[in-house]
Amino acid sequence: MTGSDGKVRVAMIGAGVMSNRVHYPSLASFEDVEIAAICDIDTERLRVTADQYAVEKRYLDYRTMVEEIAPDAVYAIGQPHIFYDIWTWCLEQGQNLYIEKPMGITLHHARSLAHLAEKHGCITQVSFQRRSTPLVSKLHAACLQRGPIVHAVCRFYKCAMDPYLEARDHMMDDGVHAIDTLRWMCGGEVVNVHSVVKRVGVPDINFFSALLEFDNGATGLMINSWTSGRRIFDVEMHAPGICAEAEHEGTGTLYIDGDTQGVTYDTREVAGSDAFHTYGGFESKNREFIDCLKAGTLPGSHFGDAVKTMEVAETILAQATLKGI
């Protein structure tokens, strides 16, 4: 799996904003990882990124890069409606693959990717990094010490009142984050979905709420709104005699046995860093993928798991369609 120097060799497709903000710095921080080559059709972005990370091998064609470099894994970070064909090609070559969310923009995309990954034995990861934020991971573990999660809540609000006219809708852009975070917090499999959605002042759906029932008895509640006055992403986790409330990029408080003061933790202090890619969970998500490459195992957000998040998202949208919304 690794090169002669023991490092995992990674080939990067894409040198855009997201990659440069969180994935390149995460990978560059790992002593056992080599960014072996970079590909981008924008020559200036390619030059700037490759120079910053001292990467000699630079390509405009991803197929040529993968064939010549023969990496241990490919990172293909870009818009899902543009990158879907790149992802399928990589999987058909048997390449281990890391992508950003969403896992395509339709359930057909997601199921096809999961099928190809399983068929070709690829180790994959969708970057649902809110599962691995150090602060929330710490609070989640503390709750589980008291017993299974009874119920969890995820709120994701933004102030974005204009019509959303991208290739993907609000659900696939942001809603999947809330669904996936709830799935991780609650554990188990979603067995029932009850939803209410709205169109508030725009032609597209910009309000989602759903109650998710899990086969382990846990209940998850998500509320996503782009009609709010500010951005919020926060969670609650409740287990017997304990609860946690947290904003991934701010603070989290743990309450035990009726205490109303709680113990508050700062996300940067828990992560031990002021770097966004670290306290935001991206470094941990990348580390999980690299470790699984070395061990030959599947990480938590492999395509076979991430497709379940997409299925819940499509269920909510289907319920809206059946209601005539």
Label each region the model flagged.
Residues 1-7, 73-75, 122, 215, ...:
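C-terminal helix-rich "cap/oligomerization" subdomain common to oxidoreductases
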Residues 1-53:
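N-terminal Rossmann-like dinucleotide-binding module
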Residues 18, 273-287, 301:
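Active-site loop of classical SDR/Rossmann-like NAD(P)-dependent oxidoreductases
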Residues 19, 99, 124-126, 153, ...:
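Hydrophobic residues in well-ordered beta-strands that form the structural core
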Residues 42, 53, 57-116:
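Beta-loop-alpha module in the N-terminal Rossmann-like domain of NAD(P)-dependent dehydrogenases
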Residues 81, 104-162:
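A contiguous active-site-proximal alpha/beta segment in oxidoreductase catalytic domains
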Residues 132-153, 172-198, 211-218, 319:
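Oxidoreductase and adenylate-handling cofactor-binding alpha/beta cores
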Residues 179-253, 279, 283-297:
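Contiguous beta-strand/loop segments that form the cofactor/metal-binding neighborhood of enzyme cores
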